[in-house]
Amino acid sequence: MPKATYFRLPAEKRHRLMDAAVQEFTRAPFAKASVSNIIQTAGIPRGSFYQYFEDKQDIFFFMLQDLGKDLGKGLLEHLETAHGDLIAGLRDFMDDLLDQVVTGTHADLFRNVFVYMDYHSAARTMYGDAKPDHHDKKKLAMSKLLPLIDHDKITIDNDHDIIMLIRVAFTWFMQVLAGYYSAKNTDHEVPIDDVKTSVATVLDWLEHGVAK
């Protein structure tokens, strides 16, 4: 997470720094991205950067968290549209999310993220790390989501298990997306419709089960 000094910056300067980070991590994968390029694009001294962030990894994960805010709002909207049907909401949200990630404004950035980021890092991006601030934000997000779920449409009767189900769904989503980018990187591109079918199939398994 950024240091307190970052949050005391004027909004224009914070946005400029985030835009510079997006530009650099879109240009190159994490390992090849450069703090020097970020500060040059943002127009700030190197010393100032380290007053705001610990290192390149710190700004990388905060950038993803910042971008994820808008993506995450979509799940709430789809769940409301589905009248609290969790699986239907997840299905519509993930279908929409795939389009945004693969063909949207930040498509090149997400390609770098999923191709070059290991699974542990991907999980951290989705669920947050052990730092209290991340943990509290994840709790806040779930506190908005859980009341929208119609419990009459699922057999799970407690919040802990619902959260676990959502994490299972998103873990599979990220694995499928990572596989898509991995194939794309080796010139064996998988049609996006096939990726959507894979995600929908797993959601069907979660909804209906697989045992006869």
Q: Where is each model-derived feature located?
A:
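Helix-turn-helix
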Residues: 16, 27-58, 62, 66
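C-terminal peripheral helix-coil segments that are non-catalytic and often amphipathic
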Residues: 143, 147, 151, 167, ...
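Alpha-helical structural segments
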Residues: 20-23, 27, 41, 58-81, ...
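Amphipathic alpha-helical packing segments from all-alpha helical-bundle domains
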Residues: 84, 88, 111, 120-156, ...
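Short, leucine-enriched amphipathic alpha-helices that occur as contiguous helical runs
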Residues: 10, 14-22, 56
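Amphipathic alpha-helical segments that line or abut small-molecule/effector binding pockets
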Residues: 84-107, 167, 196, 200-207
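Amphipathic alpha-helical segments used for helix-helix packing
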Residues: 92, 100-128, 132, 140-143, ...
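N-terminal intrinsically disordered/low-complexity leader segments
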Residues: 1-9
